[in-house]
């Protein structure tokens, strides 16, 4: 018996991903100045406000505010019309030096366990497959590519009414042994948009400029359900719609 497997991806303008990119940018800034930096940076965004907080051990001292503002603007939040703007948002920096008590516990040669070099340990696993050129399963590969295409079309001006926040889901039908993809059960593409565009124009534009260039026609069956902005309206998005927090940590 065949089964359906679904994967989801969010665009660079989705608030969760915005927080991720800000924390990443802070980490990269410290590692550029000091490759041995230990960084725990958490980002929270809501409306036109950005907070970064965390503890850092580093000889570097990058100016974080312009880095954070540029990251937000580069994503596409560069106008007050979106309610979130990298140039005008309220920025609060609550990043401080790491506690010396914690620092000695994660510095090799210090603390009670002289060989311990990290304060947190974890096990991660993953695998590659041959379903796609990216070596990832088809549903997540297509989901990633759809939101990437949405961002590209927005930045290139192909659909002038697109805004940064977007999410996609792709459901693939697999044979009972999991070795053969029989087609797609459903495609969902929700994208933020300007107020003055009709739902018909949104559906046509997304289908022609985003979905068709990415999804091979042979995967779209007569039974495939395609949902484009199924709620009917997605004007309010990003951190104006929801608040998000994301942590980026690095230890050496």
Feature annotation, model-predicted:
Residues 1-5, 45-55, 185-187:
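Short glycine-rich, basic-tinged beta-strand/loop micro-motifs
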Residues 1-38:
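N-terminal, positively charged regions that mediate nucleic acid binding
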Residues 6, 77, 85-239:
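Glycine-rich, mobile lid/loop segments that gate access to catalytic sites or pores
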Residues 37-44, 168-172:
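Short edge beta-strands and adjacent turn/loop segments
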Residues 39-42, 48-106:
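Glycine-rich, N-terminal phosphate-binding loop and its surrounding beta-alpha-beta segment
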Residues 55-62, 232-244:
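Short glycine/threonine-rich loop-to-helix capping motif typified by GTGT followed
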Residues 245-252:
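Conserved small/polar residues in nucleotide/adenosyl-binding loops
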